[in-house]
Amino acid sequence: ATKMPVALMDILASHQIRSAALSGLYAREKGRSGWFAEVSLELSGISALANQATNYLMNENIPKRQGSLHPNIAPYGEQLHLDGGSIVLAVGSDSQFAALCKILGSEELETDERFFDNQSRVKNRSILIRELQNSAKSHSRDSLLNSFHSKGVPAGAIKDLKEVFASGSPGAKAVIQEEIEGSNRIVRKPITTAYSVTVFGNNTV
């Protein structure tokens, strides 16, 4: 069995109940009565299945273990392992695939009948990633990622937490000093407001 490294269902459920509470408060402000809201961990997880749930409900397709791979799009979720780290691809259209091939100097893949359209790429994705990896092996992670971004090829660097929270990174900006003790660092919510949220003890006389 495989377990998520964080309590994902709890986090999803907390977002669902927050939305329900805010909707109730808004309804009350508009003159309607509030409501009782109930959220379960299981239903929160089911509601987050997105395209996997749709694949089953439309075609009774039960997904197999496939890691980060997208079941209906390729190369989407495939990883390129390079000097300096790895990149995960999220190529969702033929034009993006063409740009990817051009950057890697492998334009012949674009016209290869095995990869001619998305359906073909999904069918032959194990062959495709071997071809892409072979074409990319002479590149470094950061230089290739810069090329992808400049040409509109969706991709991202795979980072460990040391790199996530490195100085100057978006992750570093998400870290705040806990105001109560002043010594603990925590990750703030990814929302910026025009005022500071009141913390415990702010109004203690």
Spell out what each predicted region is.
Residues 1-86:
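Active-site-adjacent "lid/gating" segments in soluble enzymes
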Residues 47-205:
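Acyl-CoA thioester-binding alpha/beta core of soluble enzymes
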